Design a protein with these regions (language model features):
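Bacterial Sec-dependent N-terminal signal peptides
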Residues: 1-27
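ATP/NTP phosphate-donor binding region
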Residues: 24-105
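Solvent-exposed loop/turn segments at secondary-structure junctions
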Residues: 50-52, 80-81, 115-117, 143-146, ...
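Structural motif
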Residues: 73, 108-110, 138
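Long, hydrophobic/aromatic-enriched structural stretches that serve as scaffold segments
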Residues: 99-124
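Short, acidic/small-residue loops that bind anionic groups at enzyme active sites
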Residues: 127-150, 156-163
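Conserved anion/nucleotide-ligand pocket segment
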Residues: 156-204
């Protein structure tokens, strides 16, 4: 009995050690950067989480914004559906995202909004085509679940504005739009931040 317990302890310790080593290796390795967008590229707007039925006008504004940058925009098949608190069923939301990932002509996937529901489709997705041909996944809030998963797989994503962000006061998001465009097209970004005097010098 004691021998069995010792064996189990040793076995579990080995697994934990291997997992820690793997995690450290993943942290050290550089993330793969998907190709930046160019004029003429196509992006897809999808809704992996919440409802957009009453936000079509705002999503259309997002489409017009992307088009003003020289991009083509396609909507997910179920973008404006409604199923309870979700934009569509788990299967349908997965279908839209999978279609966008698998289509080689689509160079970026832009989330229409967050809310809740993205985590429910993560395990339904097949990332084979994405790994073969990475593309930018864009959004924040609930879309962070996708960022986390894709970062774990080794790919960069953009934690940035969503389609519904176009519903904000235009004057307040001018700088957001500028930095968002630069992020998509691979232009250099620079930030000027005022430090807080209460911060300790050794803080990082």
């Amino acid at each position: 009995m004691k021998v069995t317990k010792l064996f189990l302890i040793a076995f579990l310790s080995l697994i934990i050690s291997n997992n820690q080593t793997q995690a450290q290796e993943n942290t050290k390795s550089e993330l793969i950067t998907p190709p930046y967008l160019q004029k003429g590229d196509t992006i897809a707007i999808v809704a992996p989480a919440g409802i957009l039925t009453d936000r079509k006008d705002v999503i259309d504004q997002a489409k017009e914004l992307a088009e003003s940058w020289g991009l083509h925009v396609v909507y997910g098949k179920h973008l404006f559906d409604t199923v309870g608190h979700f934009s569509a069923t788990d299967e349908e939301r997965s279908e839209d995202f999978q279609t966008a990932m698998d289509n080689p002509n689509i160079k970026a996937i832009w989330a229409g909004r967050g809310g809740y529901g993205t985590v429910r489709i993560l395990d339904r997705l097949d990332y084979t085509k994405f790994i073969e041909s990475p593309k930018w996944v864009i959004g924040y809030s609930d879309i962070t679940a996708l960022h986390s998963h894709l970062n774990t797989l080794g790919y960069e994503t953009i934690h940035g504005m969503m389609g519904t962000s176009m519903g904000d006061d235009a004057e307040k998001i001018v700088e957001t739009l500028k930095s968002f465009k630069k992020s998509l097209f691979g232009e250099k970004l620079s930030y000027s931040l005022v430090s807080v005097k209460e911060n300790k010098k050794q803080s990082r």
